[in-house]
Every structure is written in C-alpha cells, then in structure tokens.
C-alpha cells in the first residue's frame, strides 16, 4: 500500500490529534479520584488501550527516524560508508513496516464481516457459453479455496441443458472469506472461441456474481414464519437411487421481499431446508447492511463499482490470455493461472486500493 507519511499534512495532523487524545486520557485515568467521577470510565479505558497500540507504533517510528538521521552522518566517512548505507536500508524497511501498521490501525474495523461467505454465480447473456463460464468460475473459486485450505460446500445448482450451470451457490468457510472475496460481486465477461465454432469467431458471454456474508445467528434478522412460502420438489441433481423418487428439494420464498432460495444438494429435505434458510438470511442481512453502510457504499461505488450484478467489473479474454479488472485498470496475462485458483494476483491490488481510499476518506 503506497502512502506518503511525511508529505501528507492531513495524516500528520490526524496522528498528532490522536497522540494528544492519548495523553489526555492517560492523565484522566492516572488520577483515581478523577477517573471514578467519569461516567464513561469503561469506554475511556477501552479507548486508551486502543490508542496505546498507536502510541507504541509512533514511538517506534520516531526511534527509527532518529537512527536513520544519526547513521547518515557516517556516510561521510569512506571507511564506514558501505556499512552505514546498509544500516540505513535496513531501518528504512523497518520504517515501512511500522508505517503500514499505522495505516491499518487507522482503517475502521470491520468485525461484522469476519465470517464465511456465499458466492452466487448466475449465467447472463451468451446461452451455452455463459453456462459453461458459470461452471468455470465455480471451479476457480473452489480451487482458490483449496489453495488456502478453506472448506467449500455447493449449496445449490441448476444444470443447463447445454452443460455447465444456469446458477450455482457456493459456501466458503473461513473467517476471512467474505473480506477477501467481497469485491468479486458484479458482472464478469468472457471472450473466447466456443468448441463448436468452426470459423474461429470469438463469442462474448456474461455471468453475474453476488458475494454475501454468512452472519452469526444473533446478528441475523428474525424471519416470521408467516412471511415464508415453502415448496418441495424432486431433486434434479446427483442423488443415487433416491433421485426423483422423493420431494427432497426445497424452495423458500420470502414474501415481503420476493427473495427466492432453492436447495437440492442434500438427499434430506431437512438439510436442504436448513441450507436454504441460511442463504435466505444472508441475502436479507446483505440488504440490511447495504442500507446501513451508506458511507462505505459511497467509497465502494466511486472506486470499485456498485457491486450490482449489472455492473461489469472484469473481462476474461482467453485468446489473448488476458484478464482486465475495469475498476482499477489492471490487466494481467495469466488467465490459466487465475482460472486454476491463483486469484490473489487480482484480489490483493483491489483490496489495497480500497484500503487506501478508506484512509483518504478518514483524512478528509
């Protein structure tokens, strides 16, 4: 994350203000009589603990700067020049690490997003090719999860008559899953030559992705039974001898919002219902969070797009081996590597850009 400390006046003033606040709280808490009179003693103690971390970073940064300046005087000595130059480089690297810690400290905590996530992939325009691309994207996210040793579970899928999927929902289990994958939401466009294309013409197809956090039970919205319509039907997926013999698949409709969720992955109707309810609650929660996080949405939309399904975020051009992320004008020529799960080369740059934008927002 590239961010200049010394040249950014707003950042210097922000850190100065926080340092003064730390000193102010320290004086209050050090006086037992004054501290007891404070109605918000607990909150002050909590704020002090947090600011104490920043204070340690700032002290380390000051110490490193002093060491660098004192070592620079040794550069004038021919015998000590190389040694001094090496020492300065070592401390400059340490300085970068401390500065990054300070930047991360300033970014608002998103504890509510430390959770598993659901990735919902739907075919768009392009017919057969779009369905095949849904399958390819599903495989890409599963491969990515395998590389990171994250557990995955296919919650629901709808087969296409031409092969691939019309729609698939994957659950990715890891506390960092949502924060890492949240910017995958949006429109994904693929350009490639279909196997059945005899004249070598490139076809363009689209898929849309929605990434939703799986919230803890106590954070999930309460759903009235009267607001639900639950239908059962026979599974069309893999199920061995039980396939199409029992109505084990579940379709849940949330009547007030008209959100519909299906699950047919399990043989058990009860398990399918539980999975479908999880997805439904996560969709409802995602809508609530979107409304509450207006400030974050402004940053997200201005920098990274709205995350809406209609908002094209990425193009995969197979003939050229190219992937372009339109939100940050990033182009790489490693399409096979990405489709095999190395998504970090696309994910990390956009997360860094997002963090930088949040810092700029804080300093306004």
Curated annotation (Swiss-Prot):
Keywords: Cytoplasm, Methylation, Protein biosynthesis
Highest taxon of source: Bacteria
InterPro entries: PCRF (IPR005139), Pep_chain_release_fac_I (IPR000352), Pep_chain_release_fac_I_sf (IPR045853), Prokaryotic/Mito_RF (IPR050057), RF-1 (IPR004373)
Main location: cytoplasm
Post-translational modifications reported in the UniProt record: Methylated by PrmC. Methylation increases the termination efficiency of RF1.
Disulfide cross-links: none
Family: Belongs to the prokaryotic/mitochondrial release factor family.
Protein name, UniProt field: Peptide chain release factor 1
UniProt organism field: Wigglesworthia glossinidia brevipalpis
Gene name tied to this protein: prfA
């Amino acid at each position: 994350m590239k961010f200049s400390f010394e040249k950014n006046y707003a950042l210097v003033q922000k850190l100065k203000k926080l340092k003064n606040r730390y000193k102010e709280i320290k004086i209050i808490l050090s006086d037992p009589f004054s501290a007891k009179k404070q109605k918000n003693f607990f909150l002050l103690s909590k704020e002090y603990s947090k600011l104490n971390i920043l204070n340690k970073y700032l002290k380390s940064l000051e110490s490193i700067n002093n060491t660098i300046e004192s070592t620079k005087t040794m550069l004038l000595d021919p015998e000590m020049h190389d040694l001094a130059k090496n020492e300065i480089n070592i401390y400059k690297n340490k300085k970068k690490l401390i500065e990054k810690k300070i930047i991360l400290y300033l970014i608002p905590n998103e504890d509510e997003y430390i959770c598993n996530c659901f990735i919902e992939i739907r075919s768009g325009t392009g017919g057969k090719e779009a369905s095949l691309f849904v399958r390819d994207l599903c495989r890409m996210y599963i491969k990515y999860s395998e590389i990171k040793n994250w557990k995955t579970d296919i919650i629901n899928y709808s087969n296409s008559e031409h092969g691939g999927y019309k729609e698939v929902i994957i659950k990715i289990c890891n506390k960092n899953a949502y924060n890492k994958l949240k910017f995958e939401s949006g429109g994904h466009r693929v350009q490639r030559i279909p196997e059945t294309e005899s004249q070598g013409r490139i076809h363009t197809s689209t898929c849309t992705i929605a990434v939703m956090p799986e919230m803890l039970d106590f954070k999930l919205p309460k759903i009235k039974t009267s607001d639900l319509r639950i239908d059962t039907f026979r599974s069309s997926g893999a199920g061995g001898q039980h396939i199409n013999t029992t109505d084990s698949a579940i379709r849940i409709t949330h009547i007030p919002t008209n959100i519909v969720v299906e699950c047919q992955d399990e043989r058990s109707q009860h398990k399918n219902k539980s999975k479908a309810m999880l997805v439904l609650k996560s969709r409802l929660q995602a809508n609530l969070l979107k409304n509450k996080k207006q400030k974050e949405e402004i940053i997200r939309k201005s920098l990274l797009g709205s995350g809406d399904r209609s908002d094209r975020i990425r193009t995969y051009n197979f003939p050229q081996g190219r992937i372009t992320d339109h939100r940050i004008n990033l182009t790489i020529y490693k399409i096979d590597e990405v489709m095999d799960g190395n998504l970090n080369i696309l994910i990390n740059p956009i997360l860094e850009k997002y963090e930088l934008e949040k810092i700029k927002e804080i300093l306004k």
